[in-house]
Amino acid sequence: MAKLHHLGFPRIGNKRQLKFALEKFWGGELSEQQLQTSAADLRQQNWLDQQDLALDLYTVGDFSLYDQVLDMSFLVGNIPSRAKQSEQDNSLDNYFRVARGRSQPQECCAASHGQSGESQAGEMTKWFNTNYHYIVPEFDAQTTFLLNAKQLLLQIEALQKINKNVKPVIIGPVTYLWLGKEKDNSQKLTLLPELLEVYAELLALFAEKNITWVQIDEPILVLEIPKQWQEALQSSYQKLGQSKVKLLLTTYFGELKNNLKLACELPIAGLHLDAVNAPHEIDSAIDYLGTDKILSLGIINACNIWKTDLNQTLNQLLPIHQKLQDRLWLAPSSSLLHVPIDLNNEDKLDYEVKSWLAFAVQKLQELSLIGRALNDGLSSVEAAFTYNKLCIENRRQSPQVHKQDIKSKVLNITPELGQRNLAIKQREALQQSYLNLPSYPTTTIGSFPQTSDIRQLRQAKRLGDINEEQYKKSIKESIEFCINEQDQLGLDVLVHGEAERNDMVEYFGELLDGFVFTQFAWVQSYGSRCVKPPILFGDVSRPKAMTVEWSSYAQSLTEKKVKGMLTGPVTILNWSFVRDDQPLQTTCMQIALAIREEVLDLEKAGINIIQIDEAALREKLPLHRSQWQQYLNWAIAAFRLCANGVNDKTQIHTHMCYSEFNDIIAAIAQMDADVITIETSRSDMVLLDVFEAFSYPNGIGPGVYDIHSPNIPDVEQMVSLMKKAALRIPAEQLWVNPDCGLKTRRWEEVKPALLNMVAAAKKLRAS
């Protein structure tokens, strides 16, 4: 009998209950006890919802109030000293201080009276090749570890009251160290022996709780890791494999390649493979695992929202099941954290498109159906399999998906469409003469605070409570307010503020053909930040201009230059749930053609600085470096396609966030944007080290303060950061800007922060 389980379930709640509870807690409207009660209710509901799915093991430890890597840091007692403001190291105050630089608003008052209420937030970066972000663990020569498993053990006890077959999930010790960053010249692998003692202690506590199986995630096995890290995995599991619990080593997000034999031969009880992305490794894994170990196959794609082809998957599994019998386990490919919770909440979605989709609940239902087909025979689920086959075939042939005229446009793309007339230095001189900007020009990344009034306005429009004319009037009032505020703050290049946009990708998807939208298909990006990605289901085109009206109006209000604000094709692709029936490259070029039309229309309307955000350029880099160049070739080509065709005096900007780009700097230079703004403040400008060896010819704005933290940046701190930047990049190429958009901040935070930023720029000009 094949056993069924999952690697993790979404934690935010089907109506984003966790987000709202967190924000109330941070705002002082909810006590710590009330927050913990809300969290417990969410966990309980998740477990109850899974009871009808015939799972053999129930997962615990997949829930987090902010981030599972941060949870692991607190579980093993690795807490930065700057965050230890509470006597209890594992307090929520300390936890949120690491996550966001501050816990609750009263700390702001403490800080203003000279107390240490604020601290620098932990660095945040992408979780492998997903749109989830984790708080980077910090290590130094003084790092020690101390187990504090109280919260996790309480969760285990709560789940055991519902079902005794409990499987805790933890991040493996080697992956945990790999994900972290040394803050000095120490070597983090030297910390492994002490860390393993804490893990061994934790596994012993699990055994005392009558736990049989523990899921231990080591996703670095899908990377090309150095030999010493392979050896670290071997030594780690030689020790941990001696515990009284059985270890299910889990990998996800791709193939193991050279690490496959290593993983299979570790002293573990079972191995989970991503069978969606690496089905070709199954036979070798069976051979390497021997006759005693469990093989868990991730057969349901946990990173997209398309229905699984149940018949095809069953046919793939039948010979494997015959060979392994009860040594075969089935699960989604990774944690379901990366997909929305329940498709049944969507009652306004196009019926045909909806029939092609599966969210987290539906994916577990698919898993259950496949398990029943294997264990009880196809006849037990024949009706469900027949319906699934009809849906798969309908999608394959739907005229909603396939548009021949768009496919023809992509086939006719030529290299010349991605070329500017003049080289960067010639364009730079032309643009400086035309734009007449000061040294260290100041700007923002695009969005300004989304107040409750703005959100209510958009909701009123959606509900039909106001007409189009009323909506436009209010948006223009918001734009006017935003322009006036920027003028008063003394910024050099302004933006219209994006009041009309609920999300930088969703906004464009709503105006492009080939997308559909949901009401409740939220996924967690980080902490309380949730996104609702559009569903890119068909060929993409632009029916009409999308931003020209708003940017033109903003420009009419000021003598200063206003940037047009667009989202780039690679980011739209990477931050959407994308069709899987054609190459990503083809879909990306369709989007690029649509954005190119918008760029040209903005220029015709008198907008001569146009920012095309590629915040997610790096996000879909293959996990194996040997495959990077193929991705970068078409990603850079897509950007160049949409960014060119304009006059050389028109200045093209782009923005990248959460990006460690040192290893792709040559590709970024090939984008040939006139100015790039990047997120560097949390890394203390360390990201700029690459420019010591690489002569980057274009303008660059290294973010001088962290917008993800509510802390107000200090003038001298920003001056210091820019001086560090000027050691690596010629001062005449530098811009001064925040590291990301200001949408999630409040005006009372934004105004003093930008005022200080402008003051820093003026001080730099005078120095």
Swiss-Prot record:
Gene3D superfamilies: 3.20.20.210. L-methionine binds at residues 445-447, 498, 613. It catalyses: 5-methyltetrahydropteroyltri-L-glutamate + L-homocysteine = tetrahydropteroyltri-L-glutamate + L-methionine. Its EC number is 2.1.1.14. 5-methyltetrahydropteroyltri-L-glutamate binds at residues 126, 529-530, 575, 619. The active site is at residue 708. GO terms for molecular function: 5-methyltetrahydropteroyltriglutamate-homocysteine S-methyltransferase activity; zinc ion binding. The keyword Zinc applies. Binds 1 zinc ion per subunit. InterPro entries: Cbl-indep_Met_Synth_N (IPR013215), Cobalamin-indep_Met_synthase (IPR006276), Met_Synth_C/arc (IPR002629), UROD/MetE-like_sf (IPR038071). Zn(2+) binds at residues 655, 657, 679, 740. L-homocysteine binds at residues 445-447, 498, 613. GO terms for biological process: methionine biosynthetic process; methylation. Pathway: Amino-acid biosynthesis; L-methionine biosynthesis via de novo pathway; L-methionine from L-homocysteine (MetE route): step 1/1. Its cofactor is Zn(2+). Keywords: Amino-acid biosynthesis, Metal-binding, Methionine biosynthesis, Methyltransferase, Repeat, Transferase, Zinc. Belongs to the vitamin-B12 independent methionine synthase family. NCBIfam families: met_syn_B12ind, PRK05222.1. Catalyzes the transfer of a methyl group from 5-methyltetrahydrofolate to homocysteine resulting in methionine formation. This is 5-methyltetrahydropteroyltriglutamate--homocysteine methyltransferase. It comes from Psychromonas ingrahamii (strain DSM 17664 / CCUG 51855 / 37).
